[in-house]
Amino acid sequence: DPPPVHDTDGNELRADANYYVLPANRAHGGGLTMAPGHGRRCPLFVSQEADGQRDGLPVRIAPHGGAPSDKIIRLSTDVRISFRAYTTCVQSTEWHIDSELVSGRRHVITGPVRDPSPSGRENAFRIEKYSGAEVHEYKLMACGDSCQDLGVFRDLKGGAWFLGATEPYHVVVFKKAPPA
């Protein structure tokens, strides 16, 4: 099996626990959350808290496809990610990569998949070790038809920071959240 992913306390990430996804460098903002974007109230985009003191919303990470008995989240394996929160959109909070280019980029959004691909892998993500890391630092990848690094970028209007397929990738750590 590939090695497990670890949280900021050095414990293995588990599919039955909640985590905050934080930037490895807190000077670069806070944790991941949901926000409306590009003039639309719904669906909600995966975005980053501007304030480095804010942890964002907790996520649940689970193996993609079926329910394997292994509850440990491992590097380089397909996972599904969803926020553990309620929204005014009354839609799923599971992440997927949007097929539509918004401001020239593919965003990670929540809610229903608008234009499913034949592979149906819009909600497949991977956690990879950050190459320069001595500690438990990682990068996220969207792995639909092919894997793409995920980074944060700013709305053209200078508003929120969104997560999507872009360079440079966003280096993250996982901090265990209290049970919901």
Swiss-Prot record:
Q: Which GO terms describe its molecular function?
A: alpha-amylase inhibitor activity; serine-type endopeptidase inhibitor activity
Top-rank taxon of the source lineage equals Eukaryota
Q: Which pairs are disulfide-linked?
A: 42-89, 143-147
Record site feature (Reactive bond), residues: 66-67
Q: Which CDD domains match?
A: beta-trefoil_STI_ASI
Alphabetized, the UniProt keywords read: Alpha-amylase inhibitor, Disulfide bond, Protease inhibitor, Serine protease inhibitor
Q: Which PROSITE patterns match?
A: SOYBEAN_KUNITZ
Q: Which Pfam families match?
A: Kunitz_legume
User: InterPro entries, from UniProt?
Assistant: Kunitz_inhibitor_STI-like_sf (IPR011065), Prot_inh_Kunz-lg (IPR002160)
Q: What does this protein do?
A: Inhibitor of endogenous alpha-amylase (wheat also produces an exogenous inhibitor which inactivates alpha-amylase from animal and insect origin). This inhibitor can also inhibit subtilisin.
For this chain, the family text in UniProt reads:
Belongs to the protease inhibitor I3 (leguminous Kunitz-type inhibitor) family.
Q: What is this protein called?
A: Endogenous alpha-amylase/subtilisin inhibitor
